Amino acid sequence: VRYGNVSGSRGSVIPFFKTLIDEGQTKIPITDMRMTRFWITLDEAVDLVIKAIGDAKGGELFIHKCPSFKVTDLAKAMLPDCEFEDVGIRPGEKLHEVMITKEDSRSAYEYDDYYIIYPDLEWWEDVNIKEGGKKVEDRFYYASDNNPVWLSVEEIREALKDIDIVY
């Protein structure tokens, strides 16, 4: 299973922003104003793991189709009147999350609400490819900045309520 930061988890920026807001901060540090992320909840991540356990034949990567959001929109959803402080991107930090690389596209298939990257190995047999999927285009690239599905500030605010973060 491959997915980005789970919304509200320790690896997510949400707890960091929440702490700043709870401390009375009105200026939110943003490493890069163009930064985007995928939105996946803990429940969605668990469901994907269970699906992978049930459907996998061995070696596949399951990737959930998630909406994207701008980190600046997340800050606005949590603190509507906030100001941004551009603090610069840190070493190793990614501007956008990448779930399927162009190299992965050679063996990636799209299903209704997820993708599967099948092993590109000699021992893998095509009969193991799950029915109902469509081979993605060559050089397909699935990242948080080129995703067709985006959350608005209001949709982020509603999604935050679903993970018990209310402002």
Please name every model-derived segment:
Residues V1-Y167:
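Strand-loop microenvironment adjacent to phosphate/nucleotide-handling motifs in alpha/beta enzyme folds
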